[in-house]
Regions:
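Helix-to-loop junction immediately C-terminal to a conserved catalytic motif
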Residues: 48
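Conserved ABC transporter NBD signature motif
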Residues: 56-65
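ABC ATPase NBD coupling module
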Residues: 65-78, 224-227
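Conserved ABC ATPase "signature" region
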Residues: 109-128
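Conserved ABC ATPase signature
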Residues: 133-137, 141
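Conserved catalytic motifs of ABC-family nucleotide-binding domains
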Residues: 154
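Catalytic Walker B motif of ABC-type/P-loop ATPase nucleotide-binding domains
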Residues: 158-161
Length: 248
């Protein structure tokens, strides 16, 4: 379980998070929605201890994440970055196994290649691409390789940062369903940030709306369309006017 209590973060005089309270149950898939600049990415970085927060606490399985110097702290996480973030200079198999070749779970190169082949199959790709380089793959294939890398270390928690950005609607739907299948099959906790409401409906068990530095609403995905929250209604329906219109 991940628990955030009163988390605040500012950059200079600019307040980004003004008191975030959030609970994410183990094995659940939470999608955080909200307009650009509301602090979604900053919040993820705070959970990952990549950004120091000013006030509040964040506990991951009852351990405060300020204990990031623990050598195994980052081993429990997987991450799918917005742009994929593959390394152009190394082949696909090494991209997938990158952390396992260097980190606390260090494995041999032959084992890493075998693991990469297995993870590729989980994301619907043939293992015959393992010796290719990212530039030789389509955007959709690159995204699936990045997803294979995110699950390579069998993480307990996976973060997805705008997973369908830059993809056509068909490939976006493929990625959404792959994410959902993997989250369910692996039994991991998933946290996704996205503007894509279609992605939200496929991936989420729970949804949190972040605005003005706080969680304005949190509920089950089947309550999203009847949340009773005007900010949520405005955002998911793309309305030009409403309680958040003056904040752009």
């Amino acid at each position: 379980m991940i628990v955030l209590e009163g988390v605040k973060k500012s950059f200079g005089k600019k307040k980004i998070l003004t008191g975030v309270n959030l609970k994410i149950n183990e094995g659940s898939s939470l999608v955080i929605i909200g307009r650009s600049g509301t602090g979604k990415s900053v919040l993820i970085k705070c959970i990952l201890a990549l950004e120091n927060y000013d006030e509040g606490t964040i506990h991951i399985n009852k351990i405060e994440n300020s204990n990031k110097n623990n050598k195994t702290f980052y081993d429990q996480f997987g991450m799918l970055f917005q742009g994929g973030a593959l390394f152009d200079s190394i082949p696909i198999w090494e991209n997938i196994s990158f952390r396992l070749l260097r980190g606390n779970q260090k494995i041999s190169r032959s084992d890493a290649k075998q693991l990469a082949s297995e993870k590729l199959k989980l994301v619907g790709l043939n293992s015959d691409i393992i010796d290719l380089y990212p530039s030789e793959l389509s955007g959709g294939m690159q995204k699936r390789v990045a997803l294979a890398r995110a699950i390579a270390g069998d993480p307990k928690v996976i973060f997805f940062d705008e997973p369908t950005t830059g993809l056509d609607p068909i490939m976006a739907n493929v990625i959404n369903r792959l994410i959902r299948e993997i989250v369910v099959e692996m039994g991991v906790t998933a946290i996704t940030i996205t503007h894509d409401i279609n992605s939200t409906r496929i991936i989420a068990d729970d949804v949190a709306m972040l605005d003005s530095g706080k969680v304005q609403w949190k509920g089950k995905i089947n309550h999203l369309d009847n949340s009773g929250n005007k900010m949520v209604d405005q955002f998911i329906n793309g309305l030009a006017t409403g309680p958040i219109s003056n904040n752009y």
